[in-house]
Each structure stands twice: as structure tokens, then as C-alpha cells.
């Protein structure tokens, strides 16, 4: 019998991505629930203020940054702590990454 197992990270860490420092509040709350978990925080300071950038630029940039960070840090989960990133890149990242990707979007 062949069974499929989910991606298991070497350090079982969580990668949190935001365009700036706003996602630090999400990091703080997740850390309260998972105090022994290792976290990586990825902030896109080169294109900060996503509202001033074109969707086409961000649709290319966000997946590139996140994929590179996943390859480098090998997290168990990617959290997009940015509404714009979640709206523009969440479906694509779920397709191309072999780890769960969680986004934040307005209700």
C-alpha cells in the first residue's frame, strides 16, 4: 500500500510574508499559540507600499519572493499576512508550492 505524506520540514518552521511590517501583528498572535515554533518573517521593502505598484508587477514578484524564501528556509507553512499578496498570489502559490499556504482576505 502506498500512502502520501505531507511535506515535512526539517525545522517545522512557519514563514510569514508581508509587504511591510504590518504582518508582525499576525506573527505576534501566531507566536502566542505556537510558542516553541520557529518563525521566518519576509518583508518586501524593495516594493513597499503595494498600493503604488501595478498588479502585473506584484503577480510576478510575490510568487518569486515566496518561492525563493520557501526554498531557503524550508518552512512547513507559508502565511501571506498581506491582503494584497493574498488577493493576487494565493491561488498561484497554492499551485506551485508543496506546503500549505494560508492567506488573509477580507470577509
Describe the role of every protein-language-model region:
Residues 2-107:
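Non-catalytic structural scaffold of enzyme domains
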Amino acid at each position: 500500500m502506498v500512502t502520501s505524506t505531507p511535506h515535512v520540514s526539517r525545522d517545522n518552521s512557519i514563514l510569514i510574508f508581508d509587504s511591510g511590517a504590518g504582518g508582525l501583528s499576525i506573527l505576534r498572535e501566531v507566536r502566542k499559540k505556537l510558542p516553541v515554533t520557529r518563525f521566518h518573517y519576509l518583508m518586501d521593502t524593495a516594493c513597499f507600499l503595494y498600493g503604488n505598484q501595478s498588479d502585473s508587477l506584484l503577480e510576478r514578484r510575490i510568487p518569486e519572493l515566496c518561492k525563493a524564501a520557501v526554498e531557503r528556509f524550508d518552512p512547513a507553512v507559508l502565511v501571506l499576512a498581506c491582503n494584497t499578496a493574498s488577493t493576487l498570489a494565493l491561488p498561484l502559490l497554492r499551485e506551485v508550492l508543496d506546503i500549505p499556504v494560508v492567506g488573509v482576505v477580507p470577509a
